[in-house]
Swiss-Prot record:
HAMAP family documented for this protein: RNase_Z_BN
Protein name: Ribonuclease Z
Catalytic class of the enzyme: hydrolase
Protein's UniProt keywords contain Zinc: yes
Organism encoding this protein: Pyrococcus horikoshii (strain ATCC 700860 / DSM 12428 / JCM 9974 / NBRC 100139 / OT-3)
Encoding gene, per UniProt annotation: rnz
NCBIfam families attached to this UniProt entry: PRK00055.1-3 (NF000801), RNase_Z (TIGR02651)
Keyword check for Metal-binding: yes
Active site: 65 (proton acceptor)
Cofactor needs: Zn(2+)
Annotated positions binding Zn(2+) 1: 61, 63, 138, 208
EC number: 3.1.26.11
Primary role: Zinc phosphodiesterase, which displays some tRNA 3'-processing endonuclease activity. Probably involved in tRNA maturation, by removing a 3'-trailer from precursor tRNA.
Summary of subunit composition and partner proteins: Homodimer.
């Protein structure tokens, strides 16, 4: 199971009601951050998320509301004597922007900070998950991300085991490790005695973007699409590099992702006003507040939890 935690759901600037963008994904004992707007450290304290559990941070682009929370996060990690390296991933220019941040004050981190500039073709593989990057359209180098939980093996099939003349026992753990073993003179393969694989969750985060086909393509068969919907309607739009609620809903329908989350709300709207208008346009959408959580069991059940 993974858990998606919304640390900041607004865009552009904080309001008394919500902070700027940051999303945490919890898998096992690890926390992965996507965007770190100013004030994210305080949001983490409220959500009871330890900075020490963060191994990787993914930045969509370098507008302030998406990355200015990094200095406070890094300095707190150092204050707590962190030794493990921190990996930060982002688009073209990441190394320069982050080095400038680290040089802006009397501060030296207690751990290595490894910056990875990635492109829209990057596919990063880790122990329990993968992260894919794709290019979006925001007027500056900008990425969206796919978080893909690795598929799990199917359950042991007792009927198949007995058909091989075997009984359940300790050998099953050895088979899990080795994938193929010899038992009682028989070669047994893990795939022969287990059911179909359980598909892992697929969470897609658009970052800031105007409508673009890449989001649709990378969201196909997704479990959850988190798409920016800065403006309620076309009349409110201030620029051409953001998305309206109606546009985000159309993108979701084309992608056939299971669930849609509308994110990065303009500070001009109260939560109540935005939610009412959003649900009148796209009744199936999830509109989270800061600190709301979504639990996902594989590619199946999606449980939205109000804080």
């Amino acid at each position: 199971m993974i858990e998606v935690i919304f640390l900041g759901t607004g865009g552009i600037k904080p309001t008394p009601e919500r902070n700027v963008p940051s999303i945490a994904i919890k898998i096992g004992g690890e926390i992965i951050l996507f965007d770190v707007g100013e004030g994210t450290l305080r949001q983490m304290e409220i959500a009871r998320i330890s900075p020490m559990k963060i191994k990787r941070v993914f930045i969509t682009h370098f507008h302030g509301d998406h990355y200015l929370g990094l200095p406070a996060l890094i300095q707190t990690m150092s204050l707590w004597k962190r030794k493990d390296p921190l990996h930060i991933y982002g688009p073209e220019g990441s190394s320069t922007f982050l080095q400038n941040l680290l040089n802006s004050g009397y501060f030296a981190p207690s751990f290595d900070i490894l910056v990875h500039e990635i492109s829209g073709k990057s596919r990063l593989k880790f122990k329990e998950y993968e992260v894919w990057a794709f290019e979006v359209s925001h007027g500056v180098p900008a990425l969206g991300y796919v978080f893909k939980e690795k598929d799990k093996r199917g359950n042991f099939n007792l009927k198949k085991i007995k058909e091989l003349g075997l009984e359940p026992g300790p050998w099953m753990k050895e088979l899990e490790r080795q994938k193929i073993i010899e038992i009682n003179g028989k070669i047994v393969r893990l795939l022969e005695v287990t059911g179909p694989k359980k598909r892992g969750a697929k969470v897609v985060y658009s970052g800031d973007t105007e409508p673009c086909d890449e989001v649709i393509e990378f969201s196909r068969r997704g479990t959850l699409l988190i798409h920016e919907a800065t403006y309620v309607n076309e009349e409110d739009r201030k620029d051409s590099y953001h998305t309206t609620i109606e546009e985000a809903c159309e993108i979701w329908k084309k992608s056939k992702a299971r669930k849609l989350v509308l994110f990065h709300r303009s500070p001009r709207y109260s939560f109540k006003e935005y939610k009412e208008k959003a649900l009148s346009i796209c009744p199936q959408a999830i509109i989270p507040r800061d600190f709301d959580r979504i639990a996902i069991e594989g590619a199946g059940d999606v449980l939205f939890k109000i804080r």
